[in-house]
């Protein structure tokens, strides 16, 4: 912090202090309603929701769903009335929470709820109850009836949070939906989105958006208009996953053998030496590896060597462009991506590991052939590459919400990015109790081996003293390596990583017990608190789960349909209220717990009351022991590139004012240290005669580590910002195409748009035929018209083109419009309008898919424009715009062509039910860049089957897209020498 910053802070106070000054009065005003709300009966409390909703609609003067939230004044109007209702509404939620869950919102939680409602990010430390905080903003905004989306990082948290908070919402008459595995476009899926609040993962929300923009019937859409989203672990979703696109794809035809052939030669290539500026030293090797940027590329010597090994004449020739791309991907697979760090191999499948959470990214695949290259490297079955049908990044998806907010324990270090990319301000919410955790200076050793030994000795001492410890690692590989060291030192410990993530909740529930040692990857129980002495609620819920296991088994075996249905209902009810039941027992409200069990016809739960009391009593005793021993000790085994991830690990300790301690054990051989000067420091230590086991500690060294992290964070921010600039080009095009699709889907009659397109196509074609001449060639016009099967002779064409170009455009437009209207009148208009819509949607979907592929190819090679002293981004925008306009031109020409030539067999349409393109075998996956799967033929056949029985003439029109796939009109391509 500079001198001016310090002066400014002293005069005006810190942002945190200023935020607290504004938010505190909101909490105080909420408190004034508490006594009044307490006196209400349950029914009166529920009726407050109806009262609030009436106030909202009266203020805005219309139904909320009629409000156009794209207009700033409407957004402001809605926000104003909700601000007015806020204190009383928050008091209502607080009372409902006390009555249903036994939890009362603290004043700081009320402040957090206000921040979320304001469309900002609430930074709240671990253990401050973010899940409960969300209920305040959710309820207030659910009063609009527009739907609130609560976005979580995984299915477990979505289900847990929804079930945990449902009793509160139910008491207040707010409906809750959970996005699980319900079938896309199903009535069940639509019913979930029609709920007042929907809990789900970022992937589920994003994929539903893409799927909704591939449907062929408006009835198949499941999402409503976007209104408000609250993103939990907002830094993880909006920053860590910002570069991750969601992609719906089908397979592309590729030669699998090529991956094996290229993989075979990679070990034969030698790494080149580089100077201090990462420039290759000529003649020293075949490829340059840049670990900082995670990049690798061939040297000139390497190019010649690969050409020789693969028997290719010119690696950069037109015929070999695919080969050089796959050679580069194979180099990355071998030299940049590491097993058990970036990915792991399980049951013959390559699974990506999230570098930020340590979890396996289920269903995700690297794109552009990288995943296939890794599969070849690991000698597992290679799956097909994919072709993109629809895609969007999380950055652009979440920016579509008129109102967006988020919560996390670590956002302040990324505040600049949140504001610049999403226009989201970060408010740091004070903790309910002061943080009592000690954050010690890093303990640094020369070698990795010395660090591990020192760490093991430290952990052994903690365990012997009955102190719980959480040890964080940055990868599965290090996690398993440290586990071996701990076993050698006879340290009892639990291992938590991507390979056994299913036990996460159970392991974290015990992580706060005396002497417990938990070795975890960066996931560190995100979303699951470590409670000192052990988590009695989690353990109590586990007891109820035992009942559910037996009941599910019984339901599975039950033959009587009636009994089976009753048992299934009972299981769902117990599952929904199990946590509320356990919390009631733990808080001493035994009668309330019994009442809850009896209400759900679950006497089996009552039988567990004594066991839950016993668990709670033991947890109390253990908690006192742990508190006396100094609380939870958190030990980091390596620094992450982002300070935020380190802070997340630290934040596991010292929750709710508990004592705790955090410290990092580092070595100069760690990746971050090695890449930012660790080798130089190591040489200094050797020169000073320091031994391998000696600890190195100095303020300047700690400062240099933080500076290294800042550099990496800054670079990653620049990369994300740069990628967004490119993606914004595609986003504008996507919005235009999806807007056209929506117009088609929601219009009963699209003839005005079709007539407009006929006029545009006619004008463009006549100008094309005439060139720069004043007159139009009647013969060319005749050929063009006959390609539409109009059946006009040359005399009629001569008459139509009399009077120059403008007159020709007018006459020919009228001629085509007359033919179009005549065609529509010859058959049932309703059938024709449906056929028309089907044809338009089919053309858009097919051409959009091709356009996405072309834009990917453009993006891949655009960087080379920099060598010609041109700005690649500017070039991408210009080229992308031209390509998009060309695609729209092709769509319009194809539409006119097909509409004018369509033949409908009578009585065929009503027997065919139009299907969604998504009923086929298309797969959707998110990826670290993309993914794979599906059946390309399936979607094409479904699009065709979606149309009525249509017969097309086989003649190729002059203005049709050339069948060769060039994207040019037929007359400018293979039709040049074939005037028809």
Swiss-Prot record:
Organism: Brachyspira hyodysenteriae (strain ATCC 49526 / WA1)
Alphabetized CDD domains for the sequence: DEXDc_SecA, SF2_C_secA
Catalytic reaction(s) noted: ATP + H2O + cellular proteinSide 1 = ADP + phosphate + cellular proteinSide 2
Cofactor note text: May bind 1 zinc ion per subunit.
Cytoplasm keyword on record: yes
SUPFAM superfamilies membership: Helical scaffold and wing domains of SecA, P-loop containing nucleoside triphosphate hydrolases, Pre-protein crosslinking domain of SecA
Cofactor: Zn(2+)
Membrane-crossing segments per the record: none
Family indicated by similarity: Belongs to the SecA family.
Subunit structure: Monomer and homodimer. Part of the essential Sec protein translocation apparatus which comprises SecA, SecYEG and auxiliary proteins SecDF. Other proteins may also be involved.
Function recorded in the entry: Part of the Sec protein translocase complex. Interacts with the SecYEG preprotein conducting channel. Has a central role in coupling the hydrolysis of ATP to the transfer of proteins into and across the cell membrane, serving as an ATP-driven molecular motor driving the stepwise translocation of polypeptide chains across the membrane.
Annotated ATP binding sites: 109, 127-131, 529
Residues the entry annotates as binding Zn(2+): 962, 964, 973-974
NCBIfam families: PRK12904.1, secA
GO molecular function per UniProt: ATP binding; metal ion binding; protein-exporting ATPase activity
Biotechnology: Has shown promise in a 4-component vaccine with BHWA1_00430 (AC C0QY54), BHWA1_00569 (AC C0QYX7) and flaAL (AC C0QWY9).
Membrane topology note: Peripheral membrane protein
Protein name: Protein translocase subunit SecA
Compartmental location: Cell inner membrane; Cytoplasm
């Amino acid at each position: 912090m500079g001198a001016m910053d310090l002066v400014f802070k002293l005069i005006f106070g810190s942002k945190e202090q200023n935020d607290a000054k504004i938010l505190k009065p909101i909490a105080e005003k909420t408190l004034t309603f508490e006594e009044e709300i307490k006196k209400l009966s349950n029914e009166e409390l529920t009726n407050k929701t109806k009262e609030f909703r009436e106030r909202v609609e009266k203020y805005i003067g219309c139904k909320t769903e009629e409000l156009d939230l794209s207009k700033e004044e409407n957004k402001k109007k809605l926000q104003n009335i909700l601000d007015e209702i806020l204190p009383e509404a928050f008091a209502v939620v607080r009372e409902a929470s006390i009555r249903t869950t036994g939890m009362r919102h603290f004043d700081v939680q009320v402040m957090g709820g206000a921040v979320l409602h304001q469309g900002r990010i609430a930074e709240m430390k671990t253990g401050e109850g973010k899940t409960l905080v969300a209920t305040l903003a959710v309820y207030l905004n659910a009063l609009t009836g527009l739907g609130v989306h609560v976005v979580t990082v995984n299915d477990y948290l979505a289900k847990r949070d929804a079930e945990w908070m449902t009793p509160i919402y139910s008491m207040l008459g707010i409906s809750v939906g959970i996005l699980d595995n319900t079938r896309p476009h199903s009535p069940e899926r639509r019913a979930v989105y029609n709920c007042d609040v929907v809990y789900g993962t970022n992937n589920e929300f994003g994929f539903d958006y893409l799927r909704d923009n591939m449907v062929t019937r408006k009835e198949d859409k499941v999402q409503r208009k976007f209104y408000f989203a609250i993103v939990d672990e907002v830094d993880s979703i909006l920053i860590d996953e910002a570069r991750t696109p969601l992609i719906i794809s089908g397979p592309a035809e590729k030669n699998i053998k090529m991956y094996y052939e290229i993989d075979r030669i990679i070990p034969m290539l030698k790494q080149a030496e580089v100077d201090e500026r990462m420039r290759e030293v000529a003649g020293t090797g075949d490829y340059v590896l840049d670990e900082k940027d995670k990049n690798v590329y061939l040297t000139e010597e390497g190019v010649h060597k690969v050409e020789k090994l693969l028997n290719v004449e010119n690696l950069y020739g037109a015929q070999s462009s695919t080969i050089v791309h796959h050679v580069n991907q194979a180099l990355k697979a071998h030299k940049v991506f590491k097993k058990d760090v970036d990915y792991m191999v399980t049951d013959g499948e390559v699974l990506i590991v999230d570098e930020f959470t340590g979890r396996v990214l289920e269903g995700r695949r690297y794109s552009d052939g990288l995943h296939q290259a890794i599969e070849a490297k690991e000698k597992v079955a290679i799956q097909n590459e994919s072709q993109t049908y629809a895609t969007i990044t999380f950055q652009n998806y979440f920016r579509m919400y008129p109102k967006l907010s988020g919560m996390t324990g670590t956002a302040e270090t990324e505040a600049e990015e949140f504001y610049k990319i999403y226009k989201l301000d970060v408010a740091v919410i004070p903790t309910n109790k002061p943080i009592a955790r000690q954050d010690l200076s890093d303990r640094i050793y020369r070698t990795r081996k010395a660090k591990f030994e020192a760490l093991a000795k430290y952990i052994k001492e903690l365990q012997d003293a009955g102190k719980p410890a959480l040890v964080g690692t940055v990868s599965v590989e290090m996690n398993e390596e440290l586990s071996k060291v701990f076993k050698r030192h006879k340290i009892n410990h639990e291992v938590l990583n991507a390979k056994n993530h299913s036990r996460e909740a159970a392991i974290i529930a015990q992580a706060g017990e005396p002497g417990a040692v938990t070795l975890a990857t960066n996931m560190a129980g995100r979303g699951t608190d470590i409670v000192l002495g052990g988590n009695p609620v989690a353990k109590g819920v586990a007891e109820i789960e035992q009942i559910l296991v037996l009941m599910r088994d019984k339901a599975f075996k039950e033959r009587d349909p009636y009994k089976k249905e009753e048992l299934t209902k009972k299981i769902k009810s117990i599952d929904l209220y199990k946590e509320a039941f356990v919390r009631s027992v733990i808080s001493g409200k035994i009668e309330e717990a019994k009442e809850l069990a009896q209400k759900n016809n679950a006497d089996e739960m009552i039988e567990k009351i004594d066991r839950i009391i016993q668990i709670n009593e033991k947890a109390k005793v253990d908690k006192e022991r742990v508190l006396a021993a100094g609380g939870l000790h958190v030990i980091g085994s390596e620094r992450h590139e982002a300070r935020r991830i380190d802070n997340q690990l630290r934040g596991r300790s010292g929750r709710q004012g508990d004592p705790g301690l955090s410290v990092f054990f580092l070595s100069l051989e760690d990746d971050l240290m090695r890449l930012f000067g660790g080798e130089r420091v190591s040489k200094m230590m050797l020169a000073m005669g320091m031994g391998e086991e000696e600890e190195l500690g100095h303020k300047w060294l700690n400062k240099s580590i933080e500076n290294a992290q800042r550099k990496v964070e800054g670079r990653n921010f620049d990369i994300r910002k740069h990628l967004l600039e490119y993606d914004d080009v595609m986003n504008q095009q996507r919005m235009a195409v999806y807007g056209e699709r929506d117009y088609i889907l929601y219009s009963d009659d699209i003839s005005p748009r079709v007539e407009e397109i006929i006029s545009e196509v006619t004008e463009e074609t006549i100008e094309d035929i005439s060139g720069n001449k004043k007159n139009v060639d009647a013969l060319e016009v005749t050929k063009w018209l006959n390609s539409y099967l109009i059946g006009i002779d040359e005399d009629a064409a001569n008459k139509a083109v009399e009077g120059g170009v403008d007159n020709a455009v007018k006459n020919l437009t009228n001629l085509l419009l007359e033919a179009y209207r005549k065609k529509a009148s010859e058959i049932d208009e309703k059938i024709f309008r449906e056929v028309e819509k089907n044809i338009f949607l089919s053309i858009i979907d097919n051409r959009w898919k091709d356009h996405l592929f072309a834009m990917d190819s453009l993006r891949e090679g655009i960087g080379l424009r920099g060598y010609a002293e041109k700005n690649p981004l500017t070039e991408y925008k210009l080229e992308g715009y031209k390509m998009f306009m060309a695609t729209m031109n092709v769509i319009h020409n194809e539409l006119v062509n097909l509409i004018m030539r369509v033949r409908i067999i009578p009585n065929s349409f009503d027997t065919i039910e139009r299907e969604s393109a998504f009923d086929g075998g298309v797969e959707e996956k998110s990826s670290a860049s993309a993914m794979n799967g599906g059946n390309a033929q399936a979607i094409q056949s479904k699009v065709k089957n979606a149309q009525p029985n249509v017969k097309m003439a086989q003649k190729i029109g002059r203005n049709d897209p050339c069948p060769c796939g060039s994207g040019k009109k037929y007359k400018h391509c293979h039709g040049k020498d074939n005037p028809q």
